Amino acid sequence: MVKVAILGAAGGIGQPLSLLTKLNPNVDELALFDVVNVPGVGADLSHINSDSKTQSYLPKDKEDKTALAAALKGSDLVIIPAGVPRKPGMTRDDLFNINASIVQGLAEGIAANSPKAFVLVISNPVNSTVPIVAETLQAKGVYDPARLFGVTTLDIVRANTFISQLFLDQTKPSDFNINVVGGHSGETIVPLYSLGNSKQYYDILSEEQKKELIKRVQFGGDEVVQAKNGAGSATLSMAYAGYRLAESILAAVNGKTDIVECTFLNLDSSIKGASEARKLVKDLDFFSLPVQLGKNGITEVKYDILNQISDDEKKLLEVAIEQLQKNIEKGVSFAKK
């Protein structure tokens, strides 16, 4: 029996993510939690004739923790798209304070009710919210770094799509699986186009085209916000990306081997390759790298990729590391308040 809980299931990302998860044959039970509108989402999804059982959980009021506890109880995988999107006039700090509090509250619920679950964090800013979840679980004595994932998959999805769009006659987006390292916002996002099968195409681009491509991957979210006239952000593509990582983890749990995905993880020495990775990223506690997945989560960090990157990518990495340090510290200090 595999139970998946989605926290923030009625939101812009939560709804399509819940739909995709409902269709996964590896899922037996789907628990949908949100503070608004979730009974309707649950009723709607429950009519789909896939085999997973769907249940929605709505707290009676702000103080009610029983709904969250029931949603989480017995969950094997928890996905967190909860939070508020940035509204006009809202600073990044405003957004951070709201989402950080939401994520911390949910992490406390996980610690109490499903401490062994795999936890996938989508709520932005991921560079800070993942450290908050780590600190919260650690404070409760139930932290396993191999089971905590910051979802950066949208950066990989965009990196694959955007290079393919420059070579429409020769390639399809599915031809690529670009490794994207660093973090999950702006200049902390470093796509490694110089490696693997993207190299032959990337190398023939002009310097200007290369810069534009990197910038597009780093700031692709802005394109969607503009196209939606400020009325929303990247929700469908984000739901797909979050689902892709969840699907990979569920496949690994079911015994599929050789699954590698990039994720923003805690470079804890208990994970194979993490200590070596730290040395290459100025001793950062968290960083996004390709990892090998197994039945118990992350089995190995594929750090060697950082020794193979181009000089241009090394420069991008330096900028990313500097910003990441601040983002991580911000999350840690919030959690320790």
From Swiss-Prot:
One of its GO terms (cellular component) is mitochondrion. Keywords: Cytoplasm, NAD, Oxidoreductase, Tricarboxylic acid cycle. Its EC number is 1.1.1.37. The active site is at 184 (proton acceptor). One of its GO terms (biological process) is tricarboxylic acid cycle. Belongs to the LDH/MDH superfamily. MDH type 1 family. This is Malate dehydrogenase, cytoplasmic. It comes from Candida albicans (strain SC5314 / ATCC MYA-2876) (Yeast). The gene is MDH1.
